[in-house]
């Protein structure tokens, strides 16, 4: 049997890291087993679903490298199939119209609360007589549709992460609403637990892999699978991603969407790498820095943890820095060029641009670091106080004057590391200065500060765009 898994996001917000991690585990499992990774957009929440969020979700998955194997299914396009399934359940007596009003439900919950009982529907309209139903209709009452759940029903499955799971019908809060309130002669909008089962059956999903917050839904859905005569998939409930306090990571914790992580300067490789480690233990001998292609060869649910996974910013930053350092300069240039364009900076040529990336790459943690670390090369820097103090040291400006003369008389067409070192050495000998004084003063003049990238290679880059001499001259 060919394995099919799916991600079923709702387009009511940006792609959340929790949803992305679920997508990643689905993708890894599918690739490990030569299966298919499918997408279903669950857009039945008409008020909150937006096209821009759908695009954000798909773009985020694509950025992470989680390619899907068929055109995404749009759930709202299948509402008639969902209603047909509800009709079937009504005809079989497995579902019924419930006329209980919102006020009556609220009173029911209050009464249960007063007795310290958990809220649940008391199934009061499960077996209405024809006369009772007629009376409700004559009152003009609307109705939801509920699926019958026997309190004594045993619900069991072998979870691929958590092992044997045992529930009973009484754990599920009474008969389940499967269609929203509507005039009694109509079927209202079908609800989540029903439509998920219908669509997973239609798509031939063999394994449902999702967060542990869906465990109660799984118990309900198993009953619907059986009632509708659909093949039951296997289930795997992955751990939640937690914040520093051990609570479920939410928008209140700040950045949680994949597009936000991307905007902050995290690479797709580091994000995929880190998300895999959020809840999955690597095999012995495997380095914790890996690609999704590498992890897809060894991924299995035996190594998925049951306990929640705490989000660790420092670990993510470390992985991101390692990914940047190990990436080719061509890759990094492609990633940061849009950032440079946003600043209004023009790259003179490919060779120069790659030299720049080679220069700044070792000190980058985020891709966005490239902007401040490159600003020296596109804008005349203001001298900070350290640079000003350096240039006021006795002999500093005189050493730069001699260096300028050495540059003018050398007639070098293209500055190299060897040329630069010789010019500094000659200036030191000619003027009787220490090379350290010349180097620090040169850095102050060229970069406006005493910290930053290698001064020799910075000088070479600036000389290639005719910015070195003018920066030295302005400090004299």
Curated annotation (Swiss-Prot):
ATP binds at residue 251. Residues 109-129 have a biased composition (Basic and acidic residues). It is found in: Cytoplasm. It catalyses: tRNA(Glu) + L-glutamate + ATP = L-glutamyl-tRNA(Glu) + AMP + diphosphate. Catalyzes the attachment of glutamate to tRNA(Glu) in a two-step reaction: glutamate is first activated by ATP to form Glu-AMP and then transferred to the acceptor end of tRNA(Glu). Monomer. This is Glutamate--tRNA ligase. The gene is gltX.
């Amino acid at each position: 049997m060919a394995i099919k898994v799916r991600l079923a996001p709702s387009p009511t917000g940006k792609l959340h890291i929790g949803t992305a991690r679920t997508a990643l585990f689905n993708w890894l499992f599918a690739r490990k087993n030569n299966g298919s990774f499918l997408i279903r957009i669950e857009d039945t929440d008409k008020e909150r679903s937006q096209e821009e969020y759908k695009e954000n979700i798909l773009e985020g998955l694509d950025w992470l490298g989680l390619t899907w194997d068929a055109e995404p299914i749009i759930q709202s396009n299948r509402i008639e199939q969902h209603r047909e399934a509800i009709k079937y359940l009504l005809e079989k007596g497995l579902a019924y119209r419930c006329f209980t009003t919102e006020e009556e439900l609220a009173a029911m919950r209050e009464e249960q609360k007063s007795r310290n009982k958990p809220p649940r529907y008391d199934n009061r309209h499960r077996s209405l007589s024809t006369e009772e139903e007629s009376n409700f209709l004559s009152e003009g009452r609307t109705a939801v549709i509920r699926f019958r759940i026997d309190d004594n029903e045993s619900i069991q499955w072998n979870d691929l992460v958590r092992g044997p799971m045992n529930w009973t019908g009484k754990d599920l809060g009474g008969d389940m609403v499967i269609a929203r309130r509507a005039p009694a002669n109509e079927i209202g909008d079908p609800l989540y637990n029903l439509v998920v089962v219908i669509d997973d059956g239609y798509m031939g999903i063999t394994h449902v892999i999702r967060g542990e917050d869906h465990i109660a839904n799984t118990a309900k859905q198993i009953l619907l699978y059986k009632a509708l005569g659909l093949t039951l998939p296997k289930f795997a409930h992955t751990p939640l991603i937690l914040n520093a306090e051990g609570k479920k990571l939410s928008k209140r914790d700040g950045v949680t969407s994949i597009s936000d992580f991307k905007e902050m300067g995290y690479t797709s490789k580091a994000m995929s790498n880190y998300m895999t480690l959020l809840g999955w233990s690597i095999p012995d001998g495997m380095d914790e820095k890996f690609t999704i292609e590498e992890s897809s060869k060894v991924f299995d649910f035996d190594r998925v943890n049951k306990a929640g996974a705490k989000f660790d910013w420092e670990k993510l930053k470390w992985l991101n820095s390692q990914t940047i350092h190990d990436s080719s300069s061509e890759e990094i240039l492609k990633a940061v060029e849009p950032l440079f364009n946003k600043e209004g900076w023009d790259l003179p040529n490919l060779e120069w641009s790659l030299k720049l990336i080679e220069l700044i790459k070792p000190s980058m943690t985020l891709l966005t670091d490239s902007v401040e670390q490159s600003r020296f090369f596109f804008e005349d820097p203001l001298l900070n106080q350290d640079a000003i103090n350096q240039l006021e040291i006795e002999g500093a400006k005189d050493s730069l004057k001699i260096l300028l003369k050495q540059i003018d008389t050398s007639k070098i067409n293209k500055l190299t590391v060897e040329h630069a070192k010789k010019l500094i050495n000659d200036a030191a000998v000619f003027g009787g200065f220490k090379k350290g004084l010349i180097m620090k003063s040169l850095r102050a003049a060229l970069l406006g500060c005493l910290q930053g990238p290698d001064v020799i290679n910075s000088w070479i880059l600036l000389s290639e765009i005719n910015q070195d001499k003018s920066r030295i001259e302005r400090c004299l």
